[in-house]
């Protein structure tokens, strides 16, 4: 929406969807557009955002939203004057988008900090840009390596982007070799329990909480996972319990007692990261696991079946 608004001064979008992990309002996006001078109307299940002219503004985000930060940047690069986003998200993806826009002629400073300054320009030009590796995909495969890997190498990644994950893995006793653009991971014979609390970057990513929960079922003792970002991020837990895990959930905290052996079962991928967690659980479970609703998994993990089978996993994918 931000790019369309910046270039064409109008954007029309039907109400958004996505994984059912909690409320996904776009009020921060719309608030930012309105601050830049746009008018927002809502009719027949769609948003219409339009402006005769966009003007720079000071915008404070009530929540450090990645999507809102990017959307406002996209619109503000073509606004008249200067825009300042306070309490901006700091994720690596923000920095990468800002670098991309600057390569096209935008004037953005402060990306990666809580305050981003954008000075509008009249035009943008084409450029060459390299998208950063997916840190959540990398983290998921590292967690799978911690569960059942033997010198599993995850290459072409940026380890600094998943520092919080790597620190927790080292804390519980994971065997890691961390290079400039790779991580080599092996399963440990004895893992220690730990507690994690999800947070905005550079804290522990909510998108890795679900697969990390699977690893915690193999740790000795009691572990706790506190989810602070999404209210429905424990949808995978009933299926892990069905497979033999000892997990209780109260409010937004899961308590995991381990280690427990897991057994193959019929499970459902309720969302993208829950699906990834169930794949991880299936790889260490005794027997066969059947996962349905795999479209959630496939849209977020390119060639996941091929990648895992290439390193020894026994996985088959079938269309129903």
Predicted features, each with a name:
Residues 1-320:
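Structural preference for solvent-exposed beta-strand-turn elements
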